[in-house]
């Protein structure tokens, strides 16, 4: 019996994929599904060698032959072929921490839909810890400490990455949850629907997954096309929650498009104006009253500049 399926989208990153596979124990109840997203020929040859030298007995490789390219399409292919009772997602440039399996298997005989685990993060070049995981670790910390409605809503709808979550496979199938076929933020609506439909869930303070930061990943690549994809997904995200949550819950989340507007400025006036019109058309508020406070604006601007300068070396 396969208890756990680990689904990994891959594109041109065989060396880090090798590291990820080495972080997974070779147990009979684990299957690993790698879906290649039309890698370049050079990397396909390396991938073939990796297949031949792997120690994992339940390692399966698939190719994305659909008419959609991207991690979302690859993850959907992985879900279609997964046999495990539980699902973990991983990105090819990340890895699991030693002992992760002992933590996740504790939940195999439970009735949870989802179990959230804390991640950590490192700079791939220096090996130093980064801040990429902090938002998600804080969501878990706040929920475990406060356990109130606000911390629960934030855990459900702000933990928008697919990794560091153990998800019941039958829960995914029952609710027909899939990843979007978009260039960026393909995981946001998947995670949002997981948060909405789950009934029984748990949060663990054990760290099982390390996400890396490196040059050229989608999270550190600046392009108008990626911004527009994220903007459209944000509109879908906002609309879904507005239509499905009750008024009090939706208001508690305090969603607004301030961040999207600020991001659009990087690409010039026309993208900014286009984003403004699109957001207004969908009746998404641009800010909360606190942004009228000049001290808040200055503090926010300083934080944005600091973050940009800190991440500059990763940008293409």
Task: Kindly give the residue locations of the regions a language model identified.
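Glycine-rich, basic loop-to-helix element that forms the pyrophosphate-binding segment
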Residues: 65-82
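A conserved acidic beta->alpha catalytic loop
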Residues: 36-47, 68, 97
